[in-house]
Amino acid sequence: MPESAFDPTPVTKIWQELGVPGILDVHTHFMPKPVMDKVWAYFDSAGPLIGRPWPITYRTEESQRVRTLREFGVLRFTSLIYAHKPQMAAWLNQWATQFAAQTPDCVHTATFFPEAGAIDYVREAIEAGAGVFKVHIQVGAFSPIDPLLVPVWGLLEDAAVPVVIHCGSGPAPGEFTGPEPIRVLLKQFPRLRLIIAHMGMPEYSDFLDISAQYDEVRLDTTMAFTKFSNEKAPFPESAYPRLVDLGHKILFGSDFPNIPYGYAEAVTALQVLPGVDDNWMRDVLYRNGAALFRVDS
């Protein structure tokens, strides 16, 4: 990993010149070490869910990763955990509760999986202060409209807790990925606060449509627009004007630490988007997330 990837100046210069207090990153990963080690090993193997070489830029010890984000000026971040099998989510939530308690700038994160008892540990997480959930439809290989999740979605809708959901078919499609299951889900739970990870890559236009249709559906920029992603899943030129129109619903995300480039590229890739101005950047990097997660200036 190049030392330049850890230089905060290219990142801090951007948000300072925009006149915002810092960055809110809704898509970062902190997990129990054995889980993170397995995730990194999978990336190293370029497994079928990834489909290409994927070097991890910020493969450092946990406290160093937290310190790196703070040096970049990230005021709030998440510990996006996700279960890929039954009887995993509850103990991940326990770990994330402890992590949030010792890391006050991390939004308390939780997850769930379609299984008996999911409603109970989701309720416990909300009562413990969870401010965001994460589910990964591709890795979890489950349908978001699984009947076991009906009470969970209902609870999350009523509690108005955001859910970062990886439901697009990138970097490789899964049995349950794509926009159609999300459309079905939102017909039943139209007030769900979904944050569509990776702008819904590669079904960008479909998920922009969904966000435009439902007031509480947002998108995060995670890995979108970067050179790495544009090689396989370029954002359609025809959709650029919609980024401006929906700028109030777009949140910055990075996928730190599991990115194959420096953190600064996740920010600079946004600056050069057609039609984007400084006000759009202020909204995406800070103001939209601050409003959603009730962060004081």
Task: Name each region found by the language model.
Residues H27, A96, A125, F133, ...:
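Conserved, mostly hydrophobic/aromatic
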Residues I23-V26, T78-L80, T109-A110, K134, ...:
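Active-site neighborhood of phospho(di)ester-bond hydrolases with catalytic His/Asp-centered motifs
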Residues M1-V26, K33-R76, L246-L251, P260-S297:
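Mid-to-C-terminal alpha-helical segments outside catalytic/metal-binding sites
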